[in-house]
């Protein structure tokens, strides 16, 4: 089994504590409300919301896929780090065993956040992941992130 790693970084004007609350801790409620084309709903199928929890995410009409299952691998609220894996769903296909993510929110000098994301694609056999496929997924994630950021800018009292 090969592992393909992809790192990306982008910025936000929203400070890490507020962004983490919206983007990580309340994403299951917030995203279906503000971006139903991306995520229709999310439900916990196993666990209590902490490490080890498995969630089924029903993707919206704007997605080419129907669902994914996320497993929470790490949740560090003090340092704004979130680790999770996509362990099932039509989005990972038959060539990938799982995709593990580490998201870190770091304070930027301007008072906003630097979002550092590392993805590990655990491939079945000697399959190679095309970088264009990964970049397309990252562009969708960045678009969803901007929707969340715009929601927070429009609602300055939310998630404080």
Curated annotation (Swiss-Prot):
Modification note: Phosphorylated in vivo. Phosphorylation prevents its activity as ribonuclease.
Q: Please provide, alphabetically and separated by semicolons, the GO molecular function terms listed in this UniProt record.
A: abscisic acid binding; nuclease activity; protein phosphatase inhibitor activity; signaling receptor activity
Give yes or no: UniProt keyword Transcription regulation: no
InterPro entries, per database record: Bet_v_I/MLP, Bet_v_I_allergen, Plant_def-hormone_signal, START-like_dom_sf
| Record keywords | Allergen, Hydrolase, Nuclease, Pathogenesis-related protein, Phosphoprotein, Plant defense
Q: Which domain of life is it from?
A: Eukaryota
Q: What is its EC number?
A: 3.1.27.-
Tissue occurrence: Highly expressed in roots. Expressed a low levels in ripe red fruits.
GO cellular component labels = cytoplasm; nucleus
Q: What is this protein called?
A: Major strawberry allergen Fra a 1.08
